[in-house]
Structures are given as C-alpha cells and as structure tokens.
C-alpha cells in the first residue's frame, strides 16, 4: 500500500492519523478547505510533530502533500488511492460524503477494481458506518453492489489528546500531541489486504473499545472541563489537579466503568489501571488544553449516544450507581461560552423552557424520569 487521502488537515489529522500513515511509509495527501493550510502543506510537503510526555521529542513528517477538499484534485486522488481516512469532526462527515461518492464512481468508471478502504477516525460510535450511509445517498444505485464488493467502510476507535497549537509558535504547521495514542479498527470490515500500519490495532470486537474510550476518556474529559469551568479553572490540567474535581471525575469514570465491566467482561483491576492512566494524561504538564475546547458543543455531548448519557443509560440498564454521572450532566447544562453556538442555544433553552424540558429534548431521557429530576436538583445546587 502506497497512497492515502486523508480528509482534515487539522491538528488531529496532522498530529495523529497523518503521522501514523506517514511513519508507515504511506504517501499522504491531506484534503482540507483551509486554503492557506493547504498551500503551506503542498509547498513544504513536511511538518513537525512535537510529542510530549515524560520525554519530549520532535518528529518531522515527510512525503505529504495537500489539496483543497472542494476541488477536482481530491476526486482524482480517490480514483487512484489505496486508503481514505478522515478526521474532520462528526458534523463534517455528511459534507465530504458527496466528494467520496463522486470519487468512487469515477474510480469505477476508470476501471480501477482494486479494493478501497475508508476509515473515519472521529469521536463518534461507528462513524464510518454512518459515513457509508451518507456516501451511498450520493452514489448511483447501480454502483451499490460493486461498492459493497470493493469498498470497505471500516469503523474505528481513536484516542489521542491533540490541543490547538500555541499562538506563540511561529510555525503554523507544527502540532503538539501527547505520547499516548490508540487507533483500533474493525478487522472484519476491510476489503482485500489489511494495511500494515504501526499503531493501528485490529480487533473483531470494536464496540468494546469504542465504548471503553467513550465512557472513560471522553466522559472524564468533558466532566473535568464542566466542573473546571464552574470553579474558574482555565485548563484541563488545572481542573484535574483540584482534589475535589479529581475525586469526582474518577468516581464518574468508575460508574461508567461498571457498565463496561458488566457489558464486556473487562477485568476490574485492568480497567481501574486504565482510568488511572487517563487521569495522568489529563494532568500532563506539557499539554495546554483549555476547558473551553473540551467543553464546547454541549448539546452534541448530551446526546443519547454520546459520552454523558450513553454511560448513564448503561447504569440504568444494569441498576448500578450513577450519582456522579448525573452531576456531570448537570454541570454540562451550566456550561456558558458566548463563542460556542451550542452553549448559547442551550442557555436560551434553559431560560425559555427550564431544565427538565431542555434535558428531555437534548438527551432523550423522559421528562418525568427519576434521573431528570435528580439532574434538576443537582443543577440547582451547582
């Protein structure tokens, strides 16, 4: 395998997926709508990644280029490529689906019958399966059976904290990432040969890993942010080093962890060690990760399949403790940020219809449920 088209040349794209692909000697073409970024990447054809942890190192990623994702160039690349990956954010998948569909149709028309694998690397459950549904809406029905045969839509779970670049840095392409990374793919969904990429782990039980990451890293991260905001902390590190927040975030992750242990049979001691590792990652002194970055888009994060309500539904299913998860949801409702449209919309909803109706709308929980009543009580105490 030689070539990949990666949608999304942002920090995750460059600092995580693009880097792993390039390290595996894959030639990566980034596709993005940010014209200055595309120009710089296509001109320099390399960038630096600062990996920070107990030891810091700077790696140079080479053999990369970039095209505008709204251009014909990206479609021509899809015709010939071996792999398509994305790190664009869940909301943008629907936008790029048409481009991918056009590329697949043109690929078939050009007589390229080699398998093509597509992996969406997003913070969403079964994101690639969602993308497939959107791509097929734009793909002529006569091509669906051929696409079923030749195009693998491979779901994945991804985990690496990549904060925005520091404003003081004069290299706009440099990106800072933590040393930890996890990219797990569903080996059952590939077509043809599975690419050999160091750092890409294969599993036949992806949902266990998707939910482990969602219920632990994502749940803990956003509760750290929302509790941190309430106490005036600016960064995730400041918030998690506050003893009361640390204790509550750990408790919330243990509550969601109980669901994982019951659902997937995870070993309790190993899962507790995973929780401790994540708490350590939040406290990484080399990562400046602002609570507003982690807390933004609260409406999406309160969705029934997302990081707060999905583990809560699991605790209801198994009859296990959930008081700290409920507090995390109450804290999410308290989140204010004038620059985030979802935060503004949420605050307007709370003013207009109150806590219970807002919760029912965003979470799908019944307005008269015990959980919604408890969240309202906690909200009024915060």
UniProtKB/Swiss-Prot annotation:
Gene Ontology biological process terms in this record: mannitol catabolic process
Amino-acid positions noted as binding NAD(+) in the UniProt annotation, renumbered to this chain: 4-15
PROSITE patterns for this protein: MANNITOL_DHGENASE
The keyword Oxidoreductase is assigned to this record: yes
Keyword terms of this UniProt record: NAD, Oxidoreductase
Xref: PANTHER family: ALTRONATE OXIDOREDUCTASE-RELATED, MANNITOL-1-PHOSPHATE 5-DEHYDROGENASE
Protein known as: Mannitol-1-phosphate 5-dehydrogenase
């Amino acid at each position: 395998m030689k070539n990949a088209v990666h949608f999304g040349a942002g920090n995750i794209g460059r600092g995580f997926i693009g880097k792993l692909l390039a390290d595996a000697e894959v030639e990566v073409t980034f596709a993005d709508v940010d014209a200055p970024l595309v120009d710089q990447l296509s001109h320099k054809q390399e960038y630096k990644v600062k990996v920070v942890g107990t030891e810091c190192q700077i790696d140079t990623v080479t053999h990369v280029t970039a095209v505008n994702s709204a251009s014909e160039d990206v479609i021509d690349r899809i015709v010939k490529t071996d792999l398509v990956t994305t790190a664009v954010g869940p909301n943008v998948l629907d936008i790029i689906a048409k481009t991918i569909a056009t590329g697949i149709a043109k690929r078939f028309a050009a007589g390229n019958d080699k398998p093509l694998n597509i992996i969406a690397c997003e913070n969403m459950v079964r994101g690639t399966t969602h993308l497939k549904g959107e791509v097929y809406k734009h793909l002529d029905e006569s091509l669906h059976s051929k696409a079923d045969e030749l195009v693998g839509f491979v779901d994945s779970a991804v985990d690496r904290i990549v904060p925005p670049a520091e404003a003081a840095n004069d290299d706009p392409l440099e990106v800072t990432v933590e040393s930890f990374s996890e990219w797990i793919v569903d080996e059952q969904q590939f077509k043809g040969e599975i690419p050999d990429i160091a750092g890409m782990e294969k599993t036949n039980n992806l949902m266990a890993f998707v939910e482990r990451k969602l219920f632990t890293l994502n749940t803990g991260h956003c509760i750290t942010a929302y509790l941190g905001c309430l106490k005036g902390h600016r960064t995730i590190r400041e918030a998690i080093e506050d003893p009361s927040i640390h204790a509550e975030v750990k408790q919330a992750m243990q509550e969601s962890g109980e669901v994982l242990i019951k659902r997937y049979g995870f070993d309790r001691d190993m899962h507790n060690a995973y929780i401790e590792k994540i708490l350590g990652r939040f406290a990484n002194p080399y990562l400046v990760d602002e609570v507003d970055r982690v807390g933004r888009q609260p409406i999406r994060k309160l969705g029934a399949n997302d990081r707060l309500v999905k583990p809560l539904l699991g605790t209801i299913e198994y009859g296990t403790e959930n008081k700290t998860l409920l507090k995390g949801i109450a804290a999410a409702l308290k989140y204010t940020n004038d620059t985030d449209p979802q935060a503004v919309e949420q605050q307007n909803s709370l003013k207009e219809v109150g806590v219970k109706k807002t919760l029912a709308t965003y979470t799908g929980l019944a307005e008269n449920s015990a959980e919604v009543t408890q969240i309202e009580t906690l909200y009024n105490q915060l």
